């Protein structure tokens, strides 16, 4: 029996996709407490499962301590990178199990660079597939999901996937290597503190430092202004000399003495 596996970005999206495409009510099942849905769409058997955001992250191929620069990295299951991502293992295991009985694969993650990377990694590392169909939708309403399925492309959006993967790698190269360099420099100064910097954080810090340097280097230049407080029937009014700022005190005093007599 031909089975199509659809992979959503998160559990709530998987449920809405299953509800939208099912000929009748989908059957909710679970593996390792991870929910997935079995259904038929126009008589064809489908299974809708989900990721839970990024299932895989970038890490060094071989750990070498706090050395830098490091450029040999690869995608690894998130739970092998961080203990806080232990829950991700059950989602990966569920996709591995479901993919073993599927012959068609469709990615239905959010249609953006992050969604494309999530879908690509689920395909190649959990399902062992090089490519898959791609649903593209902007809302999770039933009409949009049905239309997205009927008009799905036969390949993922490789432009978005490559852009997203490149950004992740640049973030890693920039963040990890420079953070290690900063920490090492602090340690060399007979101190120790873990320092961090990132692709966005670094340039932003540079802008702050430059602005602070400008403020520190600023030397105020004195100037003089001439104002007039007048009285009319409706009350008082305040007027300023048309020159606004006088950069020479003598000039300001001369004009002040002149207008004072008028």
Where are the predicted features?
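Intrinsically disordered, low-complexity regulatory segments
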Residues: 1-176, 240-260
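C-terminal or mid-to-C-terminal helical accessory/interaction module adjacent to the motor/catalytic core
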Residues: 87-93, 100-101, 143-230, 234
